[in-house]
């Protein structure tokens, strides 16, 4: 039986997951993070994108987070997300529309603030679409 660690995934709206995991995989600002039992203590900012939770027993769940923080302690992993959604609940049509609108806003930039906002919206829409693609690969 694989070694496990307790993991909590929370957002401002709700608790998304709480239970034992064999591994949690997320993207921090410095790159991919794979957290397993025995990992050194860590605090990292998260980038928007997919989070893979490999539960006790090997089943996997994929989430989308819009950013947040990951804290690793000896017996607890806590992911505090700005927004967290199960990948199966991400609306692909809405993400594609948001991507198109952000690309349009980037092309018609009127000021630095609008450009920065559009770039952030584009990055978030792209991250949502990548999460949907990962979920589709996982389901095959």
UniProtKB/Swiss-Prot annotation:
Its main location: membrane. The keyword Cell inner membrane applies. It comes from Marinobacter nauticus (strain ATCC 700491 / DSM 11845 / VT8) (Marinobacter aquaeolei). The lineage of its organism: Bacteria, Pseudomonadati, Pseudomonadota, Gammaproteobacteria, Pseudomonadales. It is found in: Cell inner membrane. It is a peripheral membrane protein. Keywords: ATP synthesis, Cell inner membrane, Cell membrane, CF(1), Hydrogen ion transport, Ion transport, Membrane, Transport. One of its GO terms (molecular function) is proton-transporting ATP synthase activity, rotational mechanism. F-type ATPases have 2 components, CF(1) - the catalytic core - and CF(0) - the membrane proton channel. CF(1) has five subunits: alpha(3), beta(3), gamma(1), delta(1), epsilon(1). CF(0) has three main subunits: a, b and c. Produces ATP from ADP in the presence of a proton gradient across the membrane. The gene is atpC. Disulfide bonds: none annotated. Belongs to the ATPase epsilon chain family. It comes from the Bacteria. GO terms for cellular component: plasma membrane; proton-transporting ATP synthase complex. This is ATP synthase epsilon chain.
């Amino acid at each position: 039986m694989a070694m496990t660690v307790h993991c909590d995934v929370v957002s401002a709206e709700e608790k998304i997951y709480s239970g034992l995991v064999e591994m949690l995989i997320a993207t921090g600002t410095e790159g991919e993070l794979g957290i397993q039992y025995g990992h050194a203590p860590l605090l990292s900012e998260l980038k928007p994108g997919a989070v893979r939770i490999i539960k006790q027993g090997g089943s996997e769940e994929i989430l989308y987070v819009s950013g947040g923080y990951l804290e690793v302690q000896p017996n607890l992993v806590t992911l505090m997300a700005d927004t967290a959604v199960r990948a199966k609940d991400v609306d692909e049509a809405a993400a594609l529309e948001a991507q198109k609108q952000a690309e349009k806003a980037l092309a018609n930039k009127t000021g630095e603030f609008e450009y920065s906002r559009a770039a952030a919206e584009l990055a978030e829409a792209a991250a949502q679409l990548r999460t949907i693609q990962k979920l589709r690969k996982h389901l095959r």
